[in-house]
Amino acid sequence: MHDPQDVMMNLVPIVVEQTSRGERSFDIYSRLLKERIIFITGPIEDHMASLIIAQLLFLESENPKKEISMYINSPGGVVSAGLGIYDTMQYIRSPVSTMCLGMAASMGSLLLTAGEKDMRFAAPNARIMVHQPSGGFRGQASDIERHAADIQKIKRRLNEIYVHHTGRTYDEIESALDRDNFMSAQEGLEFGLVDKVIERRAEDEKEGSDS
């Protein structure tokens, strides 16, 4: 049985460009990286996080004042991996805009709302899901207690991050994240997870990308 990620990588389009030195080919994601566009697609895990972090650091080194665009379509994943990306977004000097296409769930929703203020977007048919962290553990009773206490610490920290980026109170966030909470793009806007629902790119942005 084939790994879906391997199948996807084999289907990634190649872009060929003419340069003064002849033809150069890029996979589509590398070509878009040249335009300061990053994709978070699929489950968020350690390997993906290291690639996203490296791209963010590279683009900051190229131009610390220029915007980085991050497109998100993710069901979420490992909390520590997601927080690594989050911390890097806050650490670098480049402003990071975020855009949800498809789904931003769990850690995906946290990264969506972590974008630069007034630069957090969702497509009209995007779905956003927030919830509290979960985990399973086996072992001695004392180990289980420590693990449960650690999950509570993580829960509090994630709640604080949502409070910071949405402007909601801690109690509102805790209530919203108590169970899987699915929102439409408009509901995500009203909750404060994004700043705007956009259907079409602005004309001046189109012109800028063509120049």
UniProtKB/Swiss-Prot annotation:
UniProt record, GO biological process: protein quality control for misfolded or incompletely synthesized proteins
Gene3D superfamilies: 2-enoyl-CoA Hydratase, Chain A, domain 1
Xref: InterPro entries: ClpP (IPR001907), ClpP/crotonase-like_dom_sf (IPR029045), ClpP/TepA (IPR023562), ClpP_His_AS (IPR033135), ClpP_Ser_AS (IPR018215)
Reactions that this protein is recorded to catalyse: Hydrolysis of proteins to small peptides in the presence of ATP and magnesium. alpha-casein is the usual test substrate. In the absence of ATP, only oligopeptides shorter than five residues are hydrolyzed (such as succinyl-Leu-Tyr-|-NHMec, and Leu-Tyr-Leu-|-Tyr-Trp, in which cleavage of the -Tyr-|-Leu- and -Tyr-|-Trp bonds also occurs)
EC top class, as a word: hydrolase
Entry superkingdom: Bacteria
GO cellular component, as recorded: cytoplasm; endopeptidase Clp complex
Signal peptide location: none
GO molecular function: ATP-dependent peptidase activity; ATPase binding; serine-type endopeptidase activity
Annotated catalytic residues: S106 (nucleophile), H131
Family in the record: Belongs to the peptidase S14 family.
PANTHER family per the UniProt record, alphabetical: ATP-DEPENDENT CLP PROTEASE PROTEOLYTIC SUBUNIT
Subunit structure: Fourteen ClpP subunits assemble into 2 heptameric rings which stack back to back to give a disk-like structure with a central cavity, resembling the structure of eukaryotic proteasomes.
Function: Cleaves peptides in various proteins in a process that requires ATP hydrolysis. Has a chymotrypsin-like activity. Plays a major role in the degradation of misfolded proteins.
Name of the protein in question: ATP-dependent Clp protease proteolytic subunit
Organism from which the protein derives: Maricaulis maris (strain MCS10) (Caulobacter maris)
Gene field: clpP
